[in-house]
A protein has these predicted regions:
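N-terminal glycine-/serine-/threonine-rich beta1-alpha1-beta2 phosphate-ribose binding loop
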Residues: 2-130, 139-154
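Predominantly a Rossmann-like dinucleotide-binding segment in NAD(P)-dependent oxidoreductases
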Residues: 37, 150-156, 161-256
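Flexible, glycine- and charge-enriched loops at secondary-structure boundaries
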Residues: 107, 134, 215
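Short glycine-enriched loops at secondary-structure junctions
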Residues: 111, 134-135, 188-193
Length: 256
């Protein structure tokens, strides 16, 4: 597998011209968006965007027609132009990425499709915003980074917890110097999903948790912690250690 870049000297915009951490692009007066994945997260994103100025929803894509129709109705109720709809085929999302009248692809599908969709969208000239986690393996992460650097497209993982009130207040306090020189942070995220497990299409999230051990979804705790430590803004991770306790309650839940 590919060696991590952190084994090399620190990456800066001067030592690595292709770095996209500080990427800037020409402003877009009206951002034209294609949405892929219209489950709970995607539908909520559509609702939020009905309140945004300077955007146009150009495409709605999901495996299921009823979800596409529901989001189309949401646009109609907000007096927004009708979007082109895509559904039914597992590969129909590629047609959204291939359009020449879309600036941004917003991805809210199951996890395993995130990286391939991000890469395909950037390769077709689109900026990308993707729900967490952005990728499921280190190889996928590097492919996403390489594609962003090569295509010079924005590629953002939508880690929402860094914008929550507690986290953003804590970050502001840290940046104001209230905690002095920060040398240690802790982050955690506890969320019981028992009530919503059945809502995931084809039970994909439960199936992934059954097949994989460890913290498969660490971004809610890690994102705010990285901001407090100025990761990618003057500091970097050299290594990462993950530990896993026995899954006790989930097998009991499955038995029931």
């Amino acid at each position: 597998s590919r060696a991590p870049r952190s084994s090399s000297p620190a990456i800066t915009s001067t030592s690595l011209p292709t770095d996209v951490v500080g990427l800037t692009c020409e402003p877009i007066e009206t951002v034209r968006i294609g949405f892929i994945g219209l489950g709970a997260r995607g539908t909520e994103a559509i609702r939020r965007f009905t309140y945004q100025k300077g955007i146009q929803v150009k495409a709605l894509c999901d495996l299921n027609q009823f979800r596409v129709d529901s989001c189309q109705n949401m646009l109609s109720r907000a007096n927004m132009p009708e979007a082109t709809t895509y559904y039914g085929s597992e590969d129909v999302w590629k047609q959204v990425c291939e359009r020449d009248d879309i600036d941004l692809i917003y991805i809210a599908t199951d996890w395993i499709h995130h990286a391939p969709m991000m890469i395909y969208a950037m390769e077709h000239g689109k900026h990308v915003a993707c729900e967490v986690p952005a990728a499921m393996t280190l190889d996928e992460i590097w492919k996403v980074i390489d594609t962003a650097e090569r295509t010079r497209k924005h590629c953002m993982m939508l880690e929402n917890c860094v914008y929550d009130f507690f986290e953003i207040t804590t970050l502001n306090m840290a940046q104001q110097g209230l905690f002095g020189n920060i040398t240690h942070v802790k982050g955690a995220y506890n969320h019981c999903l028992y009530d919503i497990w059945p809502d995931y299409n084809a039970d994909w999230r439960m199936q992934y948790n059954m097949a994989h051990r460890g913290d498969v979804y660490p971004t809610h705790g890690m994102g705010p912690a990285c901001q407090l430590l100025d990761i990618h803004r003057g500091d970097r991770m050299k290594y990462l250690v993950a530990m896993d306790s026995d899954p006790v309650s989930l097998p009991d839940y499955l038995d029931k």
